[in-house]
UniProtKB/Swiss-Prot annotation:
Pathway the protein takes part in: Biopolymer metabolism; poly-(R)-3-hydroxybutanoate biosynthesis
GO biological processes: poly-hydroxybutyrate biosynthetic process
Keywords per UniProt: Coiled coil, Cytoplasm, PHB biosynthesis
Coiled coil in keyword set: yes
Similarity comment: family membership: Belongs to the PHA/PHB synthase family. Type III PhaE subfamily.
Protein name: Poly(3-hydroxyalkanoate) polymerase subunit PhaE
Known partners and oligomeric status: Forms a heterodimer with PhaC, which may multimerize in the presence of 3-hydroxybutyryl-CoA. Both subunits are required for PHB synthesis in E.coli and in PHA-negative A.eutrophus.
Superkingdom to which the source organism belongs: Bacteria
Gene name per UniProt: phaE
Organism: Synechocystis sp. (strain ATCC 27184 / PCC 6803 / Kazusa)
Length: 330
């Protein structure tokens, strides 16, 4: 038994050093790309009307970058601990740290939503009594708060929806749908409806990003279990390509199981529907501004393209008939 342990140690030590040295630079370049890449540059040139979406995507990209970085640091630390049997405890520590990051991300999202609703506090005071509002919200939050220690991600989603309903849907949302007066009432109505859809989109996006973060966390846990199992079977990961393959296999299984659940599909469907509604309102506002500037709207351009397409088909058909007539003059 001692000779087996010596052989295992002698094999694993140079192998772990080789793997870490060969992969460190690749990971460093990847983290730099995640921190300085596409989303940050895209925000600088994004139109003002689309500014909020790149900010949300950048926040999500940074969160996933930290998740990847933590997964690599976890494996880097676990590798030399395989011999002394302390790797399972270290895995639990890193998983707990990941769960803490997800909770911090959720708290930040809720704080941002609270700041946005604070801009309309003057309207809320006129429509609702805060004493009744917060008492009802506090009573409704007891059940979701009781689920948090169990690690149920949908408890965070329930709290997010509860706060959004208390701060916006019960008071300011009805004000947005109130009748408008004046010559500019049509344009003002479109702007208010677009703002209402944007608030609902922000809430749905926060829920969907939180769901994705939880799935990433579970995918990381599955990856760590797979790597530990392979190491114990004397089949350690030796190359960066093999590490990517194991990560993809573990993540695919977790994502497939997660998005087969009905409650997760509802969160995703809510986000897609909210995005589509917001884009429709955005298109209506854009067309109204284009009409004011005597510029062709998207609908008019689409009609022109459709007309040109039909004319091209008719010309092609006429040329074909003309060619047949010339070939058979009799």
């Amino acid at each position: 038994m001692e000779s087996t342990n010596k052989t295992w140690t002698e094999l694993m030590t140079p192998l772990s050093q080789f793997w870490l040295e060969s992969s460190s630079q690749a990971w460093k370049n990847w983290f730099d790309l995640m921190a300085k890449g596409g989303a940050g540059a895209m925000m600088g040139s994004a139109p003002q009307s689309f500014e909020s979406l790149p900010q949300q995507f950048l926040q999500s990209q940074q969160f996933y970058g930290e998740l990847l970085k933590l997964s690599f640091e976890a494996w880097q630390s676990l590798w030399p601990k395989l011999d002394n049997g302390s790797a399972p405890g270290a895995v639990q520590g890193y998983l707990k740290q990941l769960q803490t990051q997800i909770e911090q991300y959720t708290a930040t999202t809720q704080a941002l939503q609270g700041d946005m609703d604070g801009l309309w506090q003057c309207y809320i005071k006129e429509v609702q009594r805060f004493s009744q509002l917060w008492l009802s919200t506090w009573q409704s939050s007891v059940a979701p708060l009781g689920k948090l220690p169990t690690g149920d991600i949908h408890a965070w989603l329930d709290l997010n929806n509860l706060y959004g309903d208390a701060l916006y849907n019960k008071n300011l949302s009805s004000f947005m749908r109130s009748p408008l007066l004046g010559p500019s009432r049509e344009m003002n109505g479109k702007l208010l409806r677009a703002f209402d859809d944007w608030v609902k989109l922000s809430q749905a996006m926060a829920d969907y990003q939180l769901l994705e973060a939880d799935i990433q966390y579970r995918g990381f846990a599955a990856l760590m279990e797979d790597l530990l199992a392979r190491a114990k079977e004397d089949k350690p990961v030796k190359t960066w390509k093999e590490f990517q393959q194991r990560w993809a296999i573990a993540a695919d299984q977790v994502f497939e199981e997660a998005f087969c659940e009905e409650k997760n599909l509802k969160v995703r469907g809510k986000f897609i529907n909210a995005l589509n509604r917001y884009r429709i309102q955005q298109q209506e506002i854009l067309e109204a501004w284009l009409k004011m500037l005597n510029l062709p709207t998207r609908s008019e351009v689409d009609e022109i393209h459709q007309t040109i397409y039909q004319l091209r088909k008719e010309v092609k058909s006429l040329k074909k008939r003309l060619g047949e007539t010339e070939a058979n003059p009799g």
